């Protein structure tokens, strides 16, 4: 492990006097239900030893706020409901966080380490003139953390002296918070939300009857070794037998075999299922960063020197075009 370093802050004007230790978690959701990574972030936030509040922003935030209030460990839920906050663009959410910080003087502001969290937390950190710490995998104390570096190939213990800690938590490193709470729900402080900084153009959502990659207990992923998109049927057939989610390596996505929402890796989705089956995937650093925390890893590859075998619990050196159909046929 690399040696610890100190994260310094230039924000000397932020007063620490008479502050109660308190943490704000910025919720991620789709206007109807809370994103699972927020539950992981709440668990991580509770390890700071502070009172935990959750900020829910959006055009229809009330329903999600009610869900959050029932989460164990949540003391307060702040709700900012405004049409300007539809789709929760980071440029529009940040002013609400800053207004909440001004009123409640939190000692830590956190979120899950997702595209949303990575968009909003550094923005708020810049406004507060402090350094943010990303991809935290372990909380040692209120000011000491372990985070990943170099696509997950190194870990580093860091200590922050900043008066406000700005953190994103890797979801797969923390258990999701359970229900059982009764947090108070109240309106968030009003904020000046500017709409000319960014614009939401639209999104295309893929529909699938298979489990979502982020929550699936079993994931079957295919790589460049499948040679074509049509051959991904081998992956789909096996996944359907196992009730699994389907993923892919970046190489398979870049080759056009499958859409990029299936990508597992540093620039894709981070997963940690009970079982991860990698088929025709060599095991590039970028891919390993997204799945190496899986409980059991099975690799099928004809190259005995493929890096994927270094992290696999079970490795099968075989031609995937023979091995996978045989495996699928053998399953009930």
From Swiss-Prot:
Disulfide bonds listed in the record: none
Source organism phylogeny: Eukaryota, Metazoa, Ecdysozoa, Nematoda, Chromadorea
UniProt: FAD binding residues: 275-303
Quaternary organization: Heterodimer of an alpha and a beta subunit.
Organism annotation: Caenorhabditis elegans
UniProt GO cellular component terms: mitochondrial matrix; mitochondrion
Cofactor note text: Binds 1 FAD per dimer.
Needed co-factor(s): FAD
Pfam families documented for this protein: ETF (PF01012), ETF_alpha (PF00766)
Protein name: Probable electron transfer flavoprotein subunit alpha, mitochondrial
One MF term in the entry's GO annotations: electron transfer activity
Keywords for the protein's UniProt record, in alphabetical order: Electron transport, FAD, Flavoprotein, Mitochondrion, Transit peptide, Transport
